[in-house]
Amino acid sequence: MRVKIISDSTCDLSPALLERYDIAVTPLCVIKDGKDFHDGVDITPVDIFAHVDGGGDLCSTSAVSQYEYGEMFARYANEYDAVVQITIGANFSCCYQNACAAAQEYENVFVVDSENLSTGQGLLVVAAAKLAEQGLSGAEIAERVRALAPKVEASFLIERLDYMRKGGRCSAVAALGANLLHLKPCIEVRNGKMAVCKKYRGSFEKCIRQYVKERLDGREDIAPELAFITHAAADANVVAAAKEEAAQYGSFE
């Protein structure tokens, strides 16, 4: 049984992992200065940060279209016994709806709503790829991944609210106050939606250590096979602190 795993680019998996598990990617569209780019193809997060930090407007995104999903499915549906497409959470984008519409033309294409984004979605994509290596059918993989989706724990800490202010998600006054008070909001994905679960205070490295400890300390419900430490051009010392803290609570892949 040969099953092709496809994911939206929002899974944020490294090129090495994509190659290791032979995962195909459907890139979202990134709109910068009125021009369309494909996420991970001709524009990267580093490009976006450099653009905005240089005074440019905040970039926006648009979903993978039904036509683009259809092209991807046409490429693999005949070559493989089945195709499993894992999308960004349906509450974050219309990618899932577009993929479902495109999949109606195929009996062997299965679409899964990850209920997540970034490497929360990435965890499910890797899980699906491992199941494909074990020889499970497309239907079985889709069923297993749908069952895993609510069990994924994905959260992140925001160092500064500048980007949220530019995106209209908080006022300039709120952003200034949070930055002055060194407040670091923790955003958690719950039931397919994002919500603020806690606010930390202090240096980013200190907050990261406390955050990781609270996420992992005393937990007996965590699968040790794989965990992702995901960051957007964070300081190397902060990334090292997160890894060091996480290593105290298990030997993750």
Which residue stretches match the model-derived regions?
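Short beta-strand segments
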Residues: 7, 85-89, 112-113
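N-terminal glycine-rich anion-binding loop in soluble enzyme alpha/beta folds
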Residues: 4-65
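Short coil/turn segments at beta-strand junctions that form active-site/ligand-binding loops
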Residues: 1, 80-82, 223-225
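Mixed-charge interfacial surface used for oligomerization/domain docking
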Residues: 4, 10-24, 28-29, 95-110, ...
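Glycine-rich phosphate- or other oxyanion-binding loops that anchor nucleotides, phosphorylated ligands
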Residues: 55-57, 63-90, 97-98, 142, ...
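Short, contiguous strand/loop micro-motifs
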Residues: 1, 59-60, 86, 229-230
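Short beta->alpha junction loops
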Residues: 63, 114-115
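Hydrophobic residues in alpha-helical segments
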Residues: 52-53, 77, 132, 165
